[in-house]
Amino acid sequence: MSQRESLEVRMDDRLVGTLALTANHKVAFSYSEEWLEHGFSVSPFSLPLKNEVFVPKKDYFDGLFGVFADSLPDAWGQLLLERLLKERGKKEAQYSVLDRLAIVGKSGMGALTYHPQKEIGMGQQMDDLDELSVHCQKILSTQYSEKLDELYRLGGTSGGARPKIMTEIDGENWIIKFPAHVDKKDVGKMEYDYSLCAKACGIVMSETRLFSSDICPGYFGTKRFDRRIEKNEIKRAHMLTAAALLELDFNQPSLDYHELMKLTKILTRDCTEDVENMYRRMCFNVFAHNRDDHSKNFTYIYNEKDDMWRLSPAYDLTYSNTYYGEHTITVDGNGKNPGKKELVAVGVQAGMKKTYCERVAEEIRLCVNEKLEHYLK
């Protein structure tokens, strides 16, 4: 099959610009004239609003700028696509990165859409969460699942490693997660308990729920923050992960919370609420043993009306380890065993008072120890 060499990028049916495959397999981008006149920079540090052709300098986003790589699915979605293509006698290697963005089309996270989109099958509606979970396990264990089309339709363009679906509940958009094959059965209950604790610690999160199950303690669900209802219409929000903003490979430890705090201050124009919330997240991740705190787990949302970037609600807060036994993002240079000393140092350097940093860190430590003790033993 011939691979696609260019693709339109749109937002709310407005042409943002064009992606084009170069001879050295990088994907160049240029803004449309309309967007240059009425739009905004979709990636402030990498793609300023200028009339020029931008070419990525790094290779680890498959030749894309980070903002467009954010639209591609992570491990679970990639696995589903690979299985779906194999079932149809095709190989993923036959598809360029632009082909994969075309498959994402209008179904990706955030506000960017890709055209012309490529349909690869829709499947039939499945409403039973336990049934979906069982089929997810079949996929993870390399077994055949007759519901592959439906699993891809529901979760093939999502981020993250764990199986999940994106679905509508009472007119609102939700993400519901299922256990991976290495997870304990209570992984959904644990993430739900973590979300309640995080909220008690003053961390901003979307609404969360524990969906009932007959085969496990429940499935964790969270309302999507990249979708909102406005005048009876679903509006999409443009967003960027820290990995995309800084053009970083999130699989490699390459960031310190000092830099994440600085990024938050610069991007949000020193919004006190967001800077303090980032500090709380850092404290929570340390005390609640969330070591998989990589740069795709921090996101910023753009408000076009106010021309403002804001820190998104927190997500993926749960007990986690890394294969190297440390936090993915170091705390004042310490990834192995950071404590209050390092946390306060990060907060103070970000411009917060030492007494405030000490008080917040201690409050979060006590709250975590009280509410999550059974997970941390």
Please describe what each predicted stretch is.
Residues 1-295, 299-377:
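Phosphate/dinucleotide-binding and metal-coordinating scaffold of catalytic cores
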